[in-house]
From Swiss-Prot:
Quaternary state and interactors: Part of the 50S ribosomal subunit. Contacts protein L20.
Protein name (database record): Large ribosomal subunit protein bL21
Superkingdom, taxonomy of origin: Bacteria
Function summary: This protein binds to 23S rRNA in the presence of protein L20.
Family: Belongs to the bacterial ribosomal protein bL21 family.
Gene Ontology molecular function, alphabetical: rRNA binding; structural constituent of ribosome
GO cellular component, one term: ribonucleoprotein complex
Keyword set includes Ribonucleoprotein: yes
Gene that specifies this protein: rplU
Keyword Ribonucleoprotein: yes
Amino acid sequence: MFAIIETGGKQIKVEEGQEIFVEKLDVNEGDSFTFDKVLFVGGDSVKVGAPTVEGATVTATVNKQGRGKKITVFTYKRRKDSKRKKGHRQPYTKLTIDKIKA
């Protein structure tokens, strides 16, 4: 059984036991988190939401809160001695999908 959930403005296909990285969630490590925005549930019987499937939830356990690889942003204006170097690390949450309830 698999499901498509929406989190952080993205749609992610998940299965039970799968580990996924999502945009940072305000949850402590080791806690459980429930996704209510389930757009699609597939398996033996298919359920398509309009826009979400009624009563469907996906439960996950938080493994880790972290930050991604550093991205360097460099902007400049030619011949003006004007430049700026900036770095960014996107925060993420690593989850393990425990249960899909449809």
